[in-house]
A protein has these predicted regions:
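Basic, low-complexity segments
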Residues: 1-39
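Short, solvent-exposed helix-loop connector elements
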Residues: 37, 348, 354-365, 378-394, ...
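Electropositive nucleic-acid engagement tracts
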Residues: 39-50, 54-125, 131, 204, ...
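Short, conserved catalytic/metal-binding motifs centered on acidic residues
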Residues: 67, 109-123, 150, 216-222, ...
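Active-site-proximal, Lys/Arg-enriched surface segment
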Residues: 83-169, 176, 180, 314-322
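An anionic, glycine-rich sequence signature occurring as long contiguous blocks
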Residues: 156-183, 187, 191, 241-245, ...
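Domain-level cores of phosphate- or acyl-group-handling catalytic modules
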Residues: 179-261
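Conserved nucleotidyltransferase catalytic core and NTase-mimicking acidic/glycine-rich helix/loop elements
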Residues: 408-420
Protein backbone atom coordinates (compact mmCIF):
# COMPACT_ATOMS: atom_id res chain seq x y z
CA UNK A 1 0.00 0.00 0.00
CA UNK A 2 1.20 3.50 -0.75
CA UNK A 3 2.03 5.57 2.33
CA UNK A 4 -0.22 8.55 2.82
CA UNK A 5 -1.42 10.87 5.52
CA UNK A 6 -4.15 9.33 7.65
CA UNK A 7 -7.15 11.44 8.50
CA UNK A 8 -6.52 12.92 11.99
CA UNK A 9 -10.25 13.55 12.45
CA UNK A 10 -11.04 9.86 11.97
CA UNK A 11 -8.50 9.10 14.69
CA UNK A 12 -9.80 11.94 16.92
CA UNK A 13 -6.47 13.78 16.79
CA UNK A 14 -4.55 11.03 18.59
CA UNK A 15 -2.66 10.86 15.34
CA UNK A 16 -1.19 14.23 14.36
CA UNK A 17 1.08 14.87 11.44
CA UNK A 18 3.25 12.96 9.04
CA UNK A 19 5.57 11.69 11.76
CA UNK A 20 3.15 8.87 12.53
CA UNK A 21 2.46 7.90 8.90
CA UNK A 22 4.92 5.02 8.82
CA UNK A 23 3.80 3.70 12.20
CA UNK A 24 0.12 3.78 11.24
CA UNK A 25 0.84 2.26 7.84
CA UNK A 26 2.55 -0.69 9.50
CA UNK A 27 -0.26 -1.06 12.02
CA UNK A 28 -2.86 -1.01 9.25
CA UNK A 29 -1.04 -3.63 7.20
CA UNK A 30 -0.80 -5.89 10.25
CA UNK A 31 -4.47 -5.33 11.08
CA UNK A 32 -5.68 -6.11 7.56
CA UNK A 33 -3.72 -9.37 7.51
CA UNK A 34 -6.51 -10.77 9.69
CA UNK A 35 -8.90 -10.47 6.74
CA UNK A 36 -6.62 -11.64 3.93
CA UNK A 37 -7.67 -15.34 4.15
CA UNK A 38 -11.17 -14.30 3.01
CA UNK A 39 -9.80 -13.20 -0.38
CA UNK A 40 -8.65 -16.08 -2.60
CA UNK A 41 -6.94 -13.82 -5.16
CA UNK A 42 -3.99 -11.45 -4.81
CA UNK A 43 -5.76 -8.73 -6.83
CA UNK A 44 -8.72 -8.85 -4.42
CA UNK A 45 -6.41 -8.36 -1.46
CA UNK A 46 -4.78 -5.31 -3.04
CA UNK A 47 -8.15 -3.73 -3.85
CA UNK A 48 -9.42 -4.42 -0.34
CA UNK A 49 -6.34 -2.86 1.25
CA UNK A 50 -6.56 0.15 -1.08
CA UNK A 51 -10.20 0.81 -0.25
CA UNK A 52 -9.71 0.57 3.52
CA UNK A 53 -6.74 2.92 3.19
CA UNK A 54 -8.99 5.32 1.30
CA UNK A 55 -11.67 5.27 4.00
CA UNK A 56 -9.03 6.22 6.57
CA UNK A 57 -7.51 8.95 4.41
CA UNK A 58 -8.30 12.68 4.38
CA UNK A 59 -10.06 12.41 0.99
CA UNK A 60 -13.15 14.59 0.91
CA UNK A 61 -15.17 11.97 -1.00
CA UNK A 62 -14.54 8.38 0.07
CA UNK A 63 -16.16 6.47 -2.75
CA UNK A 64 -14.73 4.09 -5.33
CA UNK A 65 -13.50 6.50 -8.01
CA UNK A 66 -11.75 9.09 -5.79
CA UNK A 67 -10.03 6.34 -3.79
CA UNK A 68 -8.88 4.47 -6.90
CA UNK A 69 -7.59 7.65 -8.55
CA UNK A 70 -5.75 8.83 -5.45
CA UNK A 71 -4.05 5.56 -4.52
CA UNK A 72 -3.69 3.55 -7.73
CA UNK A 73 -4.50 5.64 -10.80
CA UNK A 74 -7.23 5.78 -13.42
CA UNK A 75 -6.76 2.22 -14.66
CA UNK A 76 -7.84 0.89 -11.25
CA UNK A 77 -11.25 2.61 -11.19
CA UNK A 78 -13.06 -0.16 -13.06
CA UNK A 79 -11.35 -3.02 -11.19
CA UNK A 80 -12.35 -1.43 -7.88
CA UNK A 81 -15.93 -1.02 -9.12
CA UNK A 82 -16.02 -4.68 -10.12
CA UNK A 83 -14.51 -5.64 -6.78
CA UNK A 84 -17.68 -4.31 -5.16
CA UNK A 85 -20.22 -5.71 -7.59
CA UNK A 86 -18.82 -8.90 -9.11
CA UNK A 87 -15.71 -10.11 -7.30
CA UNK A 88 -16.27 -13.67 -6.03
CA UNK A 89 -15.63 -13.49 -2.31
CA UNK A 90 -18.01 -14.06 0.59
CA UNK A 91 -18.87 -11.32 3.06
CA UNK A 92 -19.72 -13.65 5.96
CA UNK A 93 -16.14 -14.83 6.68
CA UNK A 94 -15.04 -11.18 6.71
CA UNK A 95 -17.86 -10.30 9.11
CA UNK A 96 -16.99 -13.28 11.35
CA UNK A 97 -13.37 -12.14 11.53
CA UNK A 98 -14.44 -8.58 12.23
CA UNK A 99 -16.81 -9.61 15.03
CA UNK A 100 -14.11 -11.76 16.63
CA UNK A 101 -11.61 -8.88 16.58
CA UNK A 102 -14.23 -6.42 17.82
CA UNK A 103 -15.21 -8.69 20.70
CA UNK A 104 -11.57 -8.97 21.76
CA UNK A 105 -11.18 -5.19 21.61
CA UNK A 106 -14.37 -4.09 23.40
CA UNK A 107 -16.54 -7.12 24.12
CA UNK A 108 -15.75 -7.75 27.77
CA UNK A 109 -17.75 -6.60 30.74
CA UNK A 110 -21.52 -6.22 31.12
CA UNK A 111 -22.10 -4.34 27.89
CA UNK A 112 -25.19 -3.41 25.91
CA UNK A 113 -26.22 -4.59 22.46
CA UNK A 114 -28.21 -1.77 20.86
CA UNK A 115 -30.27 -1.78 17.70
CA UNK A 116 -31.08 1.21 15.52
CA UNK A 117 -31.59 2.02 11.88
CA UNK A 118 -30.06 4.79 9.85
CA UNK A 119 -30.90 6.13 6.40
CA UNK A 120 -28.92 7.22 3.38
CA UNK A 121 -30.37 9.80 0.99
CA UNK A 122 -30.37 8.60 -2.63
CA UNK A 123 -31.40 10.08 -5.96
CA UNK A 124 -33.47 8.01 -8.37
CA UNK A 125 -35.21 4.67 -8.01
CA UNK A 126 -32.54 2.22 -9.09
CA UNK A 127 -30.65 1.48 -5.85
CA UNK A 128 -31.47 -1.66 -3.88
CA UNK A 129 -34.28 -1.04 -1.39
CA UNK A 130 -34.65 2.67 -2.11
CA UNK A 131 -38.05 4.30 -1.60
CA UNK A 132 -39.64 7.37 -0.11
CA UNK A 133 -39.63 6.54 3.59
CA UNK A 134 -39.01 8.20 6.92
CA UNK A 135 -35.44 9.44 7.26
CA UNK A 136 -34.51 9.91 10.91
CA UNK A 137 -31.50 12.08 10.09
CA UNK A 138 -33.75 14.64 8.37
CA UNK A 139 -36.85 14.00 10.46
CA UNK A 140 -39.06 13.69 7.39
CA UNK A 141 -39.97 11.40 4.49
CA UNK A 142 -37.26 11.29 1.84
CA UNK A 143 -36.01 9.06 -0.98
CA UNK A 144 -33.49 6.88 0.83
CA UNK A 145 -32.13 3.47 1.72
CA UNK A 146 -32.29 2.24 5.30
CA UNK A 147 -29.95 -0.10 7.11
CA UNK A 148 -30.61 -1.86 10.41
CA UNK A 149 -27.52 -2.01 12.64
CA UNK A 150 -26.43 -3.54 15.93
CA UNK A 151 -23.78 -1.95 18.12
CA UNK A 152 -22.05 -3.04 21.30
CA UNK A 153 -21.03 -0.64 24.07
CA UNK A 154 -19.18 -1.53 27.23
CA UNK A 155 -16.43 -0.40 29.56
CA UNK A 156 -13.78 -0.86 26.86
CA UNK A 157 -15.47 1.07 24.06
CA UNK A 158 -18.08 0.69 21.36
CA UNK A 159 -18.48 -0.44 17.76
CA UNK A 160 -20.96 -1.69 15.18
CA UNK A 161 -21.53 -5.45 15.34
CA UNK A 162 -23.92 -6.45 12.56
CA UNK A 163 -26.09 -4.90 9.88
CA UNK A 164 -28.61 -5.58 7.11
CA UNK A 165 -30.15 -3.54 4.32
CA UNK A 166 -33.90 -3.14 4.76
CA UNK A 167 -35.81 -3.99 1.58
CA UNK A 168 -39.34 -2.49 1.65
CA UNK A 169 -42.31 -4.79 1.10
CA UNK A 170 -43.27 -3.40 -2.31
CA UNK A 171 -39.86 -4.41 -3.62
CA UNK A 172 -41.04 -8.03 -3.44
CA UNK A 173 -44.03 -7.43 -5.71
CA UNK A 174 -44.13 -8.44 -9.37
CA UNK A 175 -43.88 -4.77 -10.32
CA UNK A 176 -40.35 -4.66 -8.89
CA UNK A 177 -39.11 -7.99 -10.28
CA UNK A 178 -36.96 -6.37 -12.98
CA UNK A 179 -35.52 -3.86 -10.51
CA UNK A 180 -34.70 -6.61 -8.02
CA UNK A 181 -32.77 -8.40 -10.75
CA UNK A 182 -31.05 -5.18 -11.84
CA UNK A 183 -29.94 -4.48 -8.25
CA UNK A 184 -28.95 -8.12 -7.67
CA UNK A 185 -31.22 -8.55 -4.66
CA UNK A 186 -30.72 -12.24 -3.69
CA UNK A 187 -33.50 -14.42 -5.08
CA UNK A 188 -33.89 -16.22 -1.77
CA UNK A 189 -34.40 -13.00 0.16
CA UNK A 190 -37.88 -12.53 1.62
CA UNK A 191 -39.51 -9.48 3.12
CA UNK A 192 -38.78 -8.76 6.77
CA UNK A 193 -39.72 -5.63 8.67
CA UNK A 194 -37.00 -3.59 10.33
CA UNK A 195 -38.16 -4.92 13.69
CA UNK A 196 -37.99 -8.52 12.46
CA UNK A 197 -34.49 -7.95 11.08
CA UNK A 198 -33.38 -6.40 14.37
CA UNK A 199 -34.89 -9.19 16.46
CA UNK A 200 -33.25 -11.88 14.33
CA UNK A 201 -29.81 -10.22 14.45
CA UNK A 202 -30.02 -9.65 18.21
CA UNK A 203 -31.01 -13.24 18.90
CA UNK A 204 -28.16 -14.52 16.70
CA UNK A 205 -25.51 -12.40 18.41
CA UNK A 206 -26.83 -13.29 21.86
CA UNK A 207 -26.74 -16.98 20.98
CA UNK A 208 -23.25 -16.66 19.52
CA UNK A 209 -21.87 -15.52 22.88
CA UNK A 210 -18.75 -13.69 21.69
CA UNK A 211 -19.82 -10.47 23.37
CA UNK A 212 -20.40 -10.25 27.13
CA UNK A 213 -23.88 -8.78 27.15
CA UNK A 214 -25.95 -7.65 30.11
CA UNK A 215 -28.36 -5.35 28.29
CA UNK A 216 -30.27 -5.10 25.03
CA UNK A 217 -31.12 -1.50 24.18
CA UNK A 218 -33.31 0.19 21.59
CA UNK A 219 -35.04 3.48 20.92
CA UNK A 220 -38.78 4.03 21.16
CA UNK A 221 -39.38 3.03 17.53
CA UNK A 222 -38.47 -0.52 18.57
CA UNK A 223 -39.34 -0.36 22.27
CA UNK A 224 -42.97 0.50 21.51
CA UNK A 225 -43.31 -2.80 19.65
CA UNK A 226 -44.36 -5.38 22.24
CA UNK A 227 -43.94 -8.23 19.75
CA UNK A 228 -40.33 -7.17 19.23
CA UNK A 229 -39.56 -7.12 22.97
CA UNK A 230 -41.46 -10.32 23.73
CA UNK A 231 -39.71 -12.14 20.88
CA UNK A 232 -36.18 -11.51 22.16
CA UNK A 233 -34.50 -14.72 23.29
CA UNK A 234 -32.56 -13.38 26.25
CA UNK A 235 -30.07 -15.65 28.04
CA UNK A 236 -30.07 -15.72 31.83
CA UNK A 237 -28.70 -12.47 33.21
CA UNK A 238 -29.50 -10.47 30.06
CA UNK A 239 -32.37 -7.95 30.09
CA UNK A 240 -33.78 -5.32 27.79
CA UNK A 241 -33.63 -1.61 28.58
CA UNK A 242 -35.95 -0.19 25.96
CA UNK A 243 -37.01 3.37 25.30
CA UNK A 244 -40.72 3.90 24.81
CA UNK A 245 -42.98 6.87 24.16
CA UNK A 246 -45.06 8.93 26.56
CA UNK A 247 -48.28 7.12 25.64
CA UNK A 248 -47.00 3.70 26.73
CA UNK A 249 -49.26 2.30 29.43
CA UNK A 250 -48.39 0.30 32.54
CA UNK A 251 -50.26 -1.06 35.54
CA UNK A 252 -49.03 0.40 38.81
CA UNK A 253 -50.48 -2.60 40.62
CA UNK A 254 -51.43 -6.02 39.35
CA UNK A 255 -55.14 -5.95 38.43
CA UNK A 256 -57.56 -8.62 39.50
CA UNK A 257 -59.75 -10.10 36.79
CA UNK A 258 -63.44 -9.78 37.59
CA UNK A 259 -66.32 -11.43 35.76
CA UNK A 260 -69.52 -9.64 36.84
CA UNK A 261 -72.71 -11.64 36.55
CA UNK A 262 -74.64 -10.75 33.42
CA UNK A 263 -78.43 -11.03 33.63
CA UNK A 264 -78.86 -10.92 29.87
CA UNK A 265 -77.09 -12.20 26.80
CA UNK A 266 -74.04 -14.37 26.49
CA UNK A 267 -71.49 -14.60 29.30
CA UNK A 268 -68.66 -12.06 29.19
CA UNK A 269 -65.53 -13.36 27.41
CA UNK A 270 -63.15 -10.71 28.70
CA UNK A 271 -62.83 -9.82 32.38
CA UNK A 272 -63.26 -6.41 33.94
CA UNK A 273 -59.99 -5.35 35.55
CA UNK A 274 -59.91 -4.06 39.12
CA UNK A 275 -57.52 -1.26 38.08
CA UNK A 276 -56.80 0.51 34.83
CA UNK A 277 -53.41 1.18 33.24
CA UNK A 278 -51.80 4.60 33.32
CA UNK A 279 -49.55 6.30 30.79
CA UNK A 280 -45.89 6.71 31.59
CA UNK A 281 -46.32 10.44 30.98
CA UNK A 282 -48.75 10.51 33.92
CA UNK A 283 -46.10 8.84 36.07
CA UNK A 284 -43.60 11.51 35.01
CA UNK A 285 -46.06 14.24 36.02
CA UNK A 286 -47.11 12.59 39.30
CA UNK A 287 -45.72 14.75 42.16
CA UNK A 288 -46.08 11.88 44.63
CA UNK A 289 -43.22 10.13 42.84
CA UNK A 290 -40.37 12.66 43.16
CA UNK A 291 -37.50 13.21 40.77
CA UNK A 292 -34.06 12.43 42.17
CA UNK A 293 -30.76 14.02 41.15
CA UNK A 294 -28.08 11.47 40.35
CA UNK A 295 -24.71 11.08 38.67
CA UNK A 296 -25.38 8.37 36.09
CA UNK A 297 -21.74 7.77 35.20
CA UNK A 298 -18.35 9.39 34.78
CA UNK A 299 -18.14 10.50 31.16
CA UNK A 300 -15.18 11.60 29.06
CA UNK A 301 -16.03 15.24 29.86
CA UNK A 302 -16.89 14.71 33.52
CA UNK A 303 -19.82 13.37 35.52
CA UNK A 304 -23.13 12.80 33.73
CA UNK A 305 -25.80 14.45 35.88
CA UNK A 306 -29.50 13.69 35.48
CA UNK A 307 -32.82 13.63 37.25
CA UNK A 308 -34.59 10.32 37.29
CA UNK A 309 -37.46 8.44 38.87
CA UNK A 310 -38.08 4.72 38.82
CA UNK A 311 -40.60 2.20 40.09
CA UNK A 312 -41.75 -1.37 39.73
CA UNK A 313 -44.93 -1.87 37.73
CA UNK A 314 -46.54 -4.30 35.29
CA UNK A 315 -46.43 -4.13 31.52
CA UNK A 316 -49.67 -3.66 29.63
CA UNK A 317 -50.39 -6.07 26.80
CA UNK A 318 -53.22 -6.51 24.31
CA UNK A 319 -55.82 -9.14 25.16
CA UNK A 320 -57.62 -10.09 21.96
CA UNK A 321 -58.61 -7.90 19.04
CA UNK A 322 -61.08 -5.48 20.61
CA UNK A 323 -58.90 -3.07 22.57
CA UNK A 324 -58.94 -5.23 25.69
CA UNK A 325 -55.76 -5.23 27.75
CA UNK A 326 -54.19 -7.40 30.40
CA UNK A 327 -51.23 -7.16 32.74
CA UNK A 328 -47.96 -8.65 31.57
CA UNK A 329 -44.70 -9.22 33.40
CA UNK A 330 -43.47 -7.17 36.31
CA UNK A 331 -40.95 -4.63 35.00
CA UNK A 332 -39.00 -1.51 35.87
CA UNK A 333 -40.20 1.86 34.62
CA UNK A 334 -37.27 4.27 34.48
CA UNK A 335 -37.68 7.95 33.60
CA UNK A 336 -34.86 10.38 32.88
CA UNK A 337 -35.29 14.17 32.72
CA UNK A 338 -32.82 16.29 30.80
CA UNK A 339 -31.73 19.85 31.58
CA UNK A 340 -34.15 21.27 29.00
CA UNK A 341 -37.07 19.46 30.64
CA UNK A 342 -37.35 16.68 28.06
CA UNK A 343 -38.25 13.31 29.59
CA UNK A 344 -37.16 9.95 28.23
CA UNK A 345 -39.10 6.83 29.18
CA UNK A 346 -37.66 3.32 29.50
CA UNK A 347 -39.06 -0.11 30.35
CA UNK A 348 -36.79 -2.84 31.63
CA UNK A 349 -37.46 -6.49 32.46
CA UNK A 350 -34.59 -6.85 34.97
CA UNK A 351 -35.51 -8.40 38.34
CA UNK A 352 -36.69 -6.39 41.32
CA UNK A 353 -33.50 -6.98 43.31
CA UNK A 354 -31.26 -5.38 40.68
CA UNK A 355 -29.59 -2.28 42.19
CA UNK A 356 -30.93 0.90 40.63
CA UNK A 357 -27.33 1.93 39.97
CA UNK A 358 -27.34 -0.74 37.27
CA UNK A 359 -30.31 0.97 35.62
CA UNK A 360 -28.44 4.28 35.82
CA UNK A 361 -25.53 2.68 34.01
CA UNK A 362 -27.79 1.14 31.37
CA UNK A 363 -29.25 4.59 30.68
CA UNK A 364 -25.81 5.74 29.46
CA UNK A 365 -25.06 2.79 27.18
CA UNK A 366 -27.43 3.39 24.26
CA UNK A 367 -25.94 6.60 22.89
CA UNK A 368 -22.77 4.92 21.48
CA UNK A 369 -24.68 3.50 18.50
CA UNK A 370 -25.49 7.08 17.51
CA UNK A 371 -21.81 7.91 18.00
CA UNK A 372 -20.88 5.02 15.69
CA UNK A 373 -23.14 6.40 12.97
CA UNK A 374 -21.73 9.89 13.44
CA UNK A 375 -18.10 8.75 13.26
CA UNK A 376 -18.67 6.44 10.30
CA UNK A 377 -20.69 8.98 8.31
CA UNK A 378 -18.60 12.04 9.12
CA UNK A 379 -15.12 10.51 9.04
CA UNK A 380 -15.18 7.20 7.15
CA UNK A 381 -17.44 7.75 4.15
CA UNK A 382 -20.31 5.55 5.31
CA UNK A 383 -22.76 7.40 3.09
CA UNK A 384 -20.39 8.02 0.17
CA UNK A 385 -21.07 4.75 -1.67
CA UNK A 386 -22.22 5.00 -5.27
CA UNK A 387 -23.05 1.34 -5.91
CA UNK A 388 -26.66 0.59 -6.70
CA UNK A 389 -26.51 -3.15 -6.11
CA UNK A 390 -27.43 -5.01 -2.94
CA UNK A 391 -23.97 -6.56 -2.78
CA UNK A 392 -22.27 -3.20 -3.26
CA UNK A 393 -24.15 -1.75 -0.27
CA UNK A 394 -23.35 -4.78 1.90
CA UNK A 395 -19.65 -4.64 1.08
CA UNK A 396 -19.32 -0.89 1.54
CA UNK A 397 -20.89 -1.00 5.01
CA UNK A 398 -18.71 -3.94 6.04
CA UNK A 399 -15.53 -2.17 4.90
CA UNK A 400 -16.55 0.98 6.81
CA UNK A 401 -17.01 -1.11 9.96
CA UNK A 402 -13.59 -2.71 9.43
CA UNK A 403 -12.01 0.74 9.06
CA UNK A 404 -13.86 2.00 12.14
CA UNK A 405 -12.45 -0.81 14.27
CA UNK A 406 -8.92 0.08 13.15
CA UNK A 407 -9.51 3.72 14.10
CA UNK A 408 -10.80 2.55 17.49
CA UNK A 409 -7.73 0.39 18.07
CA UNK A 410 -5.36 3.21 17.16
CA UNK A 411 -7.12 5.73 19.39
CA UNK A 412 -6.86 3.35 22.33
CA UNK A 413 -3.21 2.65 21.55
CA UNK A 414 -2.34 6.36 21.49
CA UNK A 415 -4.28 6.95 24.70
CA UNK A 416 -2.28 4.25 26.48
CA UNK A 417 1.01 5.67 25.22
CA UNK A 418 0.10 9.18 26.34
CA UNK A 419 -0.92 7.96 29.80
CA UNK A 420 2.51 6.44 30.44
Amino acid sequence: MNPTIFDPIALEMWYSGEANDHLLQTELENYLMNYIPSFPRKAQRKLFQTFIQGLLSPLERKSIEPIALHFSGEKYVRPLQQFFTRSPFQEQPLLDTYQTLLSKQIGAGRGMLSVDDTSFIKKGKHSAGVKRQYCGRLGKTENCQTGVFLAYAGDKGYGLVDYELYIPKEWFSEEYSALRKECHVPEEKMFASKHEIAQRMLNQILQDGRFQVQWVGCDAAYGNDHAFLDGLVLPEGVWYFAATNAKEQVFLEYPQQLFPNSKRGRPRKHPVLSSVPTSVRDVAEDPSIPWEGVVLAEGAKGPIHAERKFLRCYSCRADGNHNYVKAGDEIWLYLRKYADGEVKYFVCNAPADLPVSELDRAATLRWPIEQCFEECKSNLGMGHYECRSYRGWVRHMLFVMIAHLFATQMRESFKKKQSH
